[in-house]
Structure formats: structure tokens, C-alpha cells
């Protein structure tokens, strides 16, 4: 059974916890600010594989708070970044989160494969008071090699489920790519060792 670790991030009041609960239970819980971090578990079958999905929901943070994401970057295989389409400040916070996730690829937290990231514009049911355009979200995702979608945790149970399946598929694709690179690296090392020691054997 494959373990898939997913972290859901976003500013306070964006509905990230509501998205998780909607996916796990099909119910909409409304919005609340949690002072506790939670890890949810779900077993599912996807692409013929049995998966143990762990979803990490950190405690709500004010959007102006400083954040490092160091532990999340080391733990998670992928990220869902949530903003509220009716709150421009939440979009700015989502942008900062994406920049932070992408930045480590060239520093201390370098990975063989870039983390899967899905940017989600939540509360599509509030489009009459929209402050962030669809095009803005799409461009931010495109510029930072992320997937993108808009939806409503309050009204769209199926869309929420498909959103999570989408990021999980991206993570599984990354697993295959890592394994392929690991196998290719092992073959290259074996060939190098054979070349070095093979030549020595011939010269003896």
C-alpha cells in the first residue's frame, strides 16, 4: 500500500478545513478557525493501487503571520493551496505560500522531483462579490508550475472530490518519475563501477 501525504494550506477563513471535511464525509461543515492541527486518514483505491492518504490541516494562521513551512516541505508529497475568491488578501497569502514551496527546490530542501501543487479558488458561490478573477488564479498557477481550479466547498461535493483525486494523481505520477530516475541513476552507477573495475581487471 502506497502512503500519500498531502498538506492543505491557506489563509484564515478560506475554507480549507471545509474542503477536507467535504472530501472525507461529503458533508459541508461551514467555516471555523481551528487552533489545533489535524491529520486525517483515508484509504482509497486509485489507478489499481491501494492508497493510504494522510491529509495534514495545520491550525489556522492569520494571513499576515510569518511562516516557514520547513516541516511541511519535508513531510508532504503534495500541497493544496486555498484562497477565497472574494478576499484579495487571501490570494496574496496563497501567492506567498506558492513562492515559499517553489523556492526550496534550489536551496536546502531540494527534491529529485518538484512537489505537486494545486491552487484552489474556493467560495465560487460568492462570485457576485468576487475580488480575484479566474484569470489571475490561472496565471499564478501557470507561472509556478501548479494545477488550478475554482470551486465551492459549500455547493460542489463532486468537484471537491475530483480536485483531491487530481492532486493525488499528480503525486502518483511524481512517485513513478522518482522511481524511474532512481533506477536510471543505479544503472549509471553500476555502469561506471563496471567500467572502472573492468579496466583494472584487464590491466592485471
Curated annotation (Swiss-Prot):
Chain residues that bind GTP: 10-17, 57-63, 122-125
Enzyme Commission no: 3.6.5.2
Molecular-function GO term, any one: GTP binding
Region (Small GTPase-like): 1-204
Reactions that this protein is recorded to catalyse: GTP + H2O = GDP + phosphate + H(+)
Family: Belongs to the small GTPase superfamily. Ras family.
Protein name: Ras-related and estrogen-regulated growth inhibitor-like protein
Amino acid at each position: 500500500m502506497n502512503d500519500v501525504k498531502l498538506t492543505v494550506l491557506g489563509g484564515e477563513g478560506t475554507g480549507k478545513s471545509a474542503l477536507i471535511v467535504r472530501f472525507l464525509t461529503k458533508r459541508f461543515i461551514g467555516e471555523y478557525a481551528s487552533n489545533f492541527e489535524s491529520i486525517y486518514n483515508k484509504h482509497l483505491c486509485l489507478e489499481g493501487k491501494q492508497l493510504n492518504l494522510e491529509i495534514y490541516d495545520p491550525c489556522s494562521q492569520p494571513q499576515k503571520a510569518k511562516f516557514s513551512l520547513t516541516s511541511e516541505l519535508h513531510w508532504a508529497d503534495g500541497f493544496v493551496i486555498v484562497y477565497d475568491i472574494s478576499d484579495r488578501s487571501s490570494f496574496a497569502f496563497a501567492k506567498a505560500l506558492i513562492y515559499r514551496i517553489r523556492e526550496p527546490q534550489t536551496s536546502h530542501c531540494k527534491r529529485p522531483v518538484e512537489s505537486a501543487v494545486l491552487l484552489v479558488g474556493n467560495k465560487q458561490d460568492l462570485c457576485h462579490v468576487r475580488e480575484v478573477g479566474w484569470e489571475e488564479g490561472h496565471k499564478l498557477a501557470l507561472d509556478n508550475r501548479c494545477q488550478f481550479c475554482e470551486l465551492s466547498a459549500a455547493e460542489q461535493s463532486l468537484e471537491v472530490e475530483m480536485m483531491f483525486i487530481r492532486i493525488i494523481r499528480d503525486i502518483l505520477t511524481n512517485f513513478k518519475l522518482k522511481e524511474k530516475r532512481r533506477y536510471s541513476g543505479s544503472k549509471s552507477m553500476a555502469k561506471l563501477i563496471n567500467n572502472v573495475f573492468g579496466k583494472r581487471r584487464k590491466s592485471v
